Amino acid sequence: MPSTAKKRKKFLSSKLPPIEATILEKGIDLHRLPVHVAIIMDGNGRWAKLRLLNRIYGHEKGAETVRTIVTTTRELGIPTLTLYAFSTENWQRSSLEVSALMSLLKKFLESEKPVMMENNIRLNAIGQIERLPQDVQDVLNQTIAATRHNPGMVLNLALSYGSRAEIVRMTRILAEKAMTGRLDPQSITEETIAAHLYT
């Protein structure tokens, strides 16, 4: 016979939205969820290859998974989600695969913009955005501008991003400020460095 606690949990689950009900049933405390989740979107090509499928098909399935991740994160009330979608190393893949990934990114932005608006999601992008094809940059910038004032979850897309490249960028900015007298090198703190990183 089920205990009182189990009965109560089952009753509460029936009154909650599906995602929260699932979390309650698994015993996860909604008050102890993180405020920022970061996910490296990796392995789509390998997933497809293991199933004797085209790598590009794997990336298409990965794009579908992104929708689920964004929806779940938003429903949980997690304020910030960062998806590492395309690294600086990804430029070394075949031109066909890179082209397919850029096309997928553009389609994703176009199809998900209305969803972001409806759910108050604010889009942000980090990385060497200037390396993306111009048409992709245009759609990305339009989506960022359209969602800029949305008060809900922040979705960061890391595109043409690498942590080493970010450190180099931050170091160059600080060095340039120091050389032009706008920054005293002795005043550099952890906070100064954090303020010059993407997020």
Residue ranges and their predicted role:
Residues 1-199:
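Flexible, compositionally biased loop and terminal segments
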